A protein has these predicted regions:
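Membrane-interface extramembranous regions
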Residues: 1-130
Length: 130
């Protein structure tokens, strides 16, 4: 297993733990917000497990990159305009949220680097006689 994949696994696991720990408090804000945090925790934990048990192939890092990008985008919306059904009022920015977003950003960049590295390392096949 590679160090980069380990970084993505760590980012998934840390963010899963944080989202899971924050889910009960977000249920106080509304059922939708609580469910969103619980689902994101489960998805991140599942990704950490998937990347650990089945590390081969481009699909796990691609899904991880997509999930991290979605979490970062949803937080940007939640803090600027709010999210219509889940959290209609803009959420205040706090230190724990910023730390979580830092882990997600590291996970996103590292997952994308795994995809880029895989694309670059594909062997070029030359036709015979050239």
């Amino acid at each position: 297993m590679s160090l980069r994949r380990d970084v993505v696994i760590l980012a998934c696991a840390v963010c899963a733990g944080i989202h899971g720990a924050l889910a009960p408090a977000h249920f106080d804000d509304g059922v939708g917000a609580g469910i969103a945090f619980a689902v994101s925790a489960a998805v991140l934990a599942g990704l950490a497990l998937w990347l650990t048990l089945r590390p081969a192939g481009p699909l796990p890092p691609a899904v991880a990159a997509l999930v991290f990008a979605g979490l970062l985008a949803s937080y940007a919306l939640a803090t600027t305009t709010g999210v219509l059904v889940l959290h209609p009022e803009p959420e205040p920015v706090d230190g724990l949220a910023l730390a979580t977003k830092a882990f997600e950003l590291v996970g996103l960049v590292t997952a994308l680097s795994l995809l880029r590295r895989r694309a670059i390392s594909l062997p070029l096949i030359q036709p015979k006689g050239t």
